[in-house]
Each structure stands twice: as C-alpha cells, then as structure tokens.
Amino acid sequence: MSKVNQDIIKRIEEAQLKSDVPAFGPGDTVVVQVRVKEGEKERLQAYEGVVIAKRNRGLHSAFTVRKISSGEGVERTFQTHSPAISSIAVKRRGDVRRAKLYYLRDRSGRSARIKEKLN
C-alpha cells in the first residue's frame, strides 16, 4: 500500500475515534450503556462488569467485560469506538498486576474478588 493511501486511511480512522472514552483498564468495574434496537424502538441497556482484557489498536480497540448473571459467568467483548456504545462509566478502580485477567474464569465467589485501588 502506498504512503498516500496509508495517510488517507489514517485520517479517516482518526475522524471515527470517540473522544469521550474514559481511562480504564483491567480490573476496573465499568458500566457500558449499549444501544439495543428492538423492532422500531431503540433503548439503552446497561452492562456492568469487570474488565478482564483490553486491546489498544486505535480505531480497532476492544475490551472484554465479565459479569455474573444468574450464577453463570457471562463475557462480552465491545469495540471501544463502536457507535452502538452510548457511554462507558468507571464505577470502581481495581488493583491488579496482570494485563489479562483470564484466570477469573476459573474462580467464583470470594476468590474472584479484586482489590480496590485506593489512590
């Protein structure tokens, strides 16, 4: 691909980036407001859980949120700059030492808790 094409793609991608995305990372508890279309109507659905993975790739950035629903673990991956996401709110900062928290999949109850970052 030529340099000109790369510059054009870069400019288009930068225009698509959302500017209202808060700083969050693995271990943080977030509330993601997702636009859900049901027939003619559109509503917002809140999805609250712990961020277990984050992928930073500009426009292609994504993060995975895990929550326990009816005693069953549910994970959902969101594209950070997707138009389907209305807002992201950080509810609690988690203090973790890993970038990917996949080990939480094997744990439940008290062992799946994450310490809160105090600063």
UniProtKB/Swiss-Prot annotation:
It comes from the Bacteria. One of its GO terms (molecular function) is structural constituent of ribosome. Keywords: Ribonucleoprotein, Ribosomal protein. PROSITE patterns: RIBOSOMAL_L19 (PS01015). Gene3D superfamilies: 2.30.30.790. Signal peptide: none annotated. One of its GO terms (cellular component) is cytosolic large ribosomal subunit. This is Large ribosomal subunit protein bL19. It comes from Pseudoalteromonas atlantica (strain T6c / ATCC BAA-1087). The gene is rplS.
